[in-house]
Amino acid sequence: MCCLFGLIDYNNIFTAKEKNRLIKILSTECEARGTDATGIAFNTENGLHISKRPVAAHKMCYRIPDSSKVVMGHTRMTTQGSEKFNFNNHPFPGHVDKLDFALAHNGVLHNDSELRITERLPKTNIQTDSYVAVQLIEKENTLNFDSIKKMAEKTEGSFCYTILDVKNNLFIVKGNNPMAVYKFNGFYLYASTDEILTRAIKKIGLKNYSKINISCGDILKISPNGMIEMQTFEFKDRYYGMFGSGYGYTAYDPYDYESNDIYIGEIAEYASYFGIDPEDVMMLIEYGYDELEIEEMLYDPLEMQKCISEIKLCEMMC
């Protein structure tokens, strides 16, 4: 599980020192969803800059200048494409007609290999599934609601994207993965979950905010002046049934994302990358483990397998 995070300081509330401190605290809280790599994108007078390294957020040294009003960030838990090769880490650079942009993704795409063939996308050394989103936008040669909508409707799987262009427009493209956006007096903060964002806000010492509603199928655009625009796309995931009744656990709707901040469907999907059967994840739910406990187990897959084996042994003996 990865985490998206960021700041839109449209009223120039913060100094460079304050921005760097804020992003440090926010990104460190995001380590709950990924410690393999950390990256940020921001604009200066010289254009779009991306800074990323295969390290946990608390080890990153941020140098965000005073002139940078928007910071888009990502902490990574590796699934596809080694974090040791920095080009696999987020955010990814992109370019359309006279416009640079950066894209970050939380989730797992299932049809990236198919899209590379059917859309005749250029060959690349980047191994992550996420990068096809950049290539699909580049194929349209423009960055706007229409090109983003086309990209979102072609990619299948779990996702939430953030896209920052060189003009300081930030797009949030919400599929079935979580996103929390809070508006303060003169700036916005966002992160993948309310829990992460509220913990960071408390540590930073901020108060008095309102929550921006964003649902699955929404494309939210925040302009450099803080204005919000919203359009929609059709979210579709032909892998919906992967964690549903096919495994025999019909009582739980794994994609009831609006009522769950930590999503069992996504956790089960990530667990499969570590050789853990998604059905076993659902079994843990049946035995009373909550989403956060299961997510924490993924940081020690061997211990998770041990727990699963003990439950199965107990079932056999009963």
What are these regions (language model features)?
Residues 1-318:
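Conserved short alpha-helical segments that host acidic/polar catalytic motifs at enzyme active sites
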